[in-house]
Amino acid sequence: MAYLLTFGIIAALCLASISLYRYGNIPRQHILVTLSVLTAWCFSFLIVFTIPLDVTSTLYRQCLAEHKLALDAAGNASTTANITPPPECQEPWGMVPESVFPNLWRIIYWSSQFLTWLIMPLMQSYLKAGDFTIKGKLKSALIENAIYYGSYLFICGVLLIYIAVKGVPLDWQKLKAIASSASNTWGLFLLILLLGYALVEVPRSLWNNAKPGFTLQYAYFKAAKLSTDKAEAEEHVDDILESLQCISRVVPNNHELRPCVETIMRKVPIELQERASRNFSRTGGSGMGATSSTILPSEKALVRIHKQVIKSLQTLQRTEALWSVQVDTVLHLEDVARNIHSAERRFKSEFPRQRTQLERIFYSATLQWYWECLLKAPFLKTLCVVTATMSAMVVWSEVTFFSRDPVLSIFANVIYLAKESYDFFTIEVFSMMVLCYFFYCTYSTILRIRFLNLYYLAPHHQTNEHSLIFSGMLLCRLTPPMCLNFLGLIHMDSHIIPERMMETYYTRIMGHMDVIGIISNGFNIYFPMCMLAFCLSTWFSLGSRALNALGFQQFLQNETIATELVQEGKDLIAREKRRRQRAEEAMARRRDFNRPDPTVASNDYMNKYRSGAGALAGSRTPADGLLRDGDGSFDYAAVASSSALGVPRSLSEEINDRFGVSTQMQVGFRGTSELDPDYEAENERRIVGPPPRGLFDDV
């Protein structure tokens, strides 16, 4: 009967694995980072998938208790044997023994708390440290976290002193309740911020995505901003690498700090090193490192520049990847705008990519036209109406879930109606739908959060390890209060509605939707008001307007800056299209020139036998032998060679003959595979092997 729980565990593991594969770069990141983030994401998803089973299990236990009381009351009221007993309770789907959920929640709770408060912060600080030994990295990580957690301990000490002054007796259970309340307080207020934004932004983004014109304008705007970010990242990398070039020239090869310099240099790609060397030679070292060009750096200076190199290279790699993805998005939207009025009803792309056999069968050009140009917009508008209705229900229930009599929460009323008929299937499906919407709103906001440009989850394997760990910490800290909030909405938190229903196993282990006693007075008033205030501010785009006023450009219609950035994005995309067209033409010419012509070889073969019989032995001209018709043997390689035939060689062949094939240029774009699939496949074959060292790569 535990098949639903097994299915939930498998679904959580699959979803976490797919998400980690999409955002992370598993072959290149350390195994400890992969396992920690996978565990954090899997446990967070598992909580969401398992809560409905705990709810139905609790309702079933309450049904058994009520059934027993009804039987006892019927037996006491009459001694006759003809009294009809009350209907028996039916077990819900996926019923498990009573000991399963308490043990499961304990494992998830303590593992998540251990990861989010101890392991992952230390791992994050370890990755950011610029030291060159394990001991140095651990020391820097411990110092950074000691400062971070020291502030928490100071606040906890103040709270304990306050409680002691109030005369409240303290024991282990009291301290555990205080810690749980503090964690819930932090999580609930962060949840207010995320849900207040997402409950409005999710339906609005679906509606805007149904408008091709708006989507294309916004894509141009994002392209302009990404181009600026990419230029700033490149400039920052050049400045840091110029300082690194100064240090590399100053530190001699036999110096004790030379291995540290080599460790930093190994982090920098070869092309960036060559560009930095050219810039250094051109400027004569007059950049950032010129003032200390004759002074040997200290180990602390090398640690500092090592940390800067790691951070700047990660930012550059992420901005380049996002720029490539954004260019592909804009080109696709332009293709949609171009094909929307097509009479052929076949989707044609300006830069077609290689399609697999399955794509050509199940997603042909005709099907793609019907989806992109005809069906996608109505589908997104329908989803917008559904999500807007769900958002309105969530906001209303958040505002009214503290009302015990009458019950005003929509979600609580649905659970009560299903409970009266013991319709556990409806309860499970409804709970899963609501939790999945909570899950999508909260986690989609986390995935798109851009905290001071340090942590950002970029798809297509472009997310660094720091951002993955940060997202795992947020999920572990937000999931318990999010589920407690849901249990409060359906009136199954005994600390909010004590007389309604039995307590779930989840609230027994995870705690209740309580807050610190100092701020608990009036919580049922300002909690809904904060939720409503954030929703209204998102509806009127107050946050975007404030950021725009502070100089952080936001996409606001009828704004001069936004219009200028849209036009700049159009120009950048037009330039990128011309560059891709030139690259495709150059590759096509190169492939055509290097492809041997079978007609030339056959003509040379026939001329050899035609001229061999009638040629005079004594009449030789300077041109004789150019076609190698004097030999008895036939050299196919020589015949097929363009140089043997007297055809002028190209510049690339001349360079290859003089300096070797390794000097030839490959024209292409990072992140695109449609230009030359053979070249991309060769690159993939070349980089296959053991992944580079990650966490302990400096040791």
From Swiss-Prot:
Among its keywords, does the record have Membrane? yes
The UniProt transmembrane annotation reads: 4-26, 31-51, 107-127, 145-165, 182-202, 382-402, 427-447, 468-488, 515-535
GO terms for cellular component: membrane
Bilayer disposition of the protein: Multi-pass membrane protein
Give the Pfam families listed for this entry: LMBR1
Q: Which residues lie on this side of the membrane: Cytoplasmic?
A: 27-30, 128-144, 203-381, 448-467, 536-699
Q: Which regions of this chain are Extracellular-facing, per the record's topological domains? A: 1-3, 52-106, 166-181, 403-426, 489-514
Segments carrying the region annotation (Disordered) are 669-699
Glycosylation site residues: 76
Recite the UniProt keywords alphabetically. Answer: Coiled coil, Glycoprotein, Membrane, Transmembrane, Transmembrane helix
Intracellular or extracellular location(s): Membrane
Give yes or no: UniProt keyword Zinc-finger: no
Regions annotated as coiled coil? 564-592
Indicate the family of this protein. Answer: Belongs to the LIMR family.
- What's the name of the protein? LMBR1 domain-containing protein 2 homolog
Organism, as annotated: Drosophila pseudoobscura pseudoobscura
